[in-house]
Design a protein with these regions (language model features):
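Short, flexible helix/strand-to-coil boundary loops that buttress conserved ligand/catalytic motifs
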Residues: 17, 46, 53, 82-84, ...
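Basic/aromatic recognition patch in beta-strand/loop cores that engages polyanionic ligands
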Residues: 37, 44-77
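N-terminal processing/targeting junctions
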Residues: 11-13, 41, 73
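Arg/Lys-rich, positively charged N-terminal/basic patches that mediate binding to nucleic acids
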Residues: 1-32
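Enriched for short, Lys/Arg-rich terminal
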Residues: 29, 68, 72-97
């Protein structure tokens, strides 16, 4: 199983990488590694993680970083809807659906 980004989620993801890299050299790469490891787990067993927004939007926390990946299965793939900061209002991204 593979994954793809909602266009707005891709922009957010790249902003997170740039932010961490601007804070400390190599921190952006650590964020990317944590995100990639999270997506490996999601792609291996997408239904293992809890439904955040019914009927099918699930959540997985990026280990070591204050973000949740919200995703859904679309056919044989995973759509990353948002990489949501823990401090941001829940559901701010629902207009993307």
């Amino acid at each position: 199983m593979s994954y793809f980004f909602n266009p707005e989620a891709r922009v957010e993801h790249l902003e997170h990488v740039a932010y961490y890299e601007s804070r400390q050299s190599g921190l952006g790469a650590r964020y990317l590694a944590a995100f990639d490891a999270a997506m490996v787990k999601v792609c291996e067993a997408p239904h293992r993680y809890g439904v955040e927004f019914p009927p099918d939007i699930r959540r997985y926390r990026v280990p070591g970083f204050p973000y949740n990946i919200l995703y859904r299965q679309v056919g044989a793939d995973i759509e990353v809807l948002v990489i949501a900061p823990h401090r941001r209002r829940p559901g701010y991204w629902l207009g993307r659906l």
